[in-house]
Amino acid sequence: DVLGSVRDRSLAIEGQDYIIVDSLDSETEWGQALECCDVVVHLAGRAHMLNDEAADPLEAFRRTNTIGTLNLAEQAANSGVSRFIFLSSIGVNGAATSGMPFNVYDSPSPHSPYAVSKLEAEIGLRAIAKRTSLDVVIIRPPAIYGKNAPGNFGLIEKFIRIGIPLPVGSINNKRSLVAIENVVSFIAVCIEH
């Protein structure tokens, strides 16, 4: 069985069981959702804030992406959840490399408040895993594309749709992309193995 959590009833998938969670922070109580739960797949977070109005963006990202994530993981560990799958970000690695793709051995070099908050969550999750029986899986996907993609990919898609020319011919920059379907398949593998 799968139980989802959404901020708003309109975001729920028809026919899917879910609970409404107003916020993701240190105060969020996950007890009901974690009853009889074996695996948590944590995809929620604060992201894609193109015109961020927060007085302190890093603190706003930390409240949700770091503290909210660690609160959920602590409650999951205390509830007997066996695995916690966390969708982090390739931004933890940095903004760019010198001609080589990022790899698992690269030192983290987050380039934005969002990426800093994700790295801090990763560090906290590893600490929770060390002192509990919770198995933690951290996924750092590159830009994810698919129907109604948010963030930079959604913005590029919008520019193309309305006819704004993109200067891609003059850019010497390589970026990795992954289809949402492939991310979902990988998460399914992480759940089963």
Where are these regions (language model features)?
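Glycine-rich "substrate-gating" loop/helix at the edge of Rossmann-like oxidoreductase active sites
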Residues: 111, 142-149, 170-180
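Conserved Rossmann-fold NAD(P)-dependent oxidoreductase catalytic core, especially the SDR/UDP-sugar
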Residues: 70-113, 129, 137
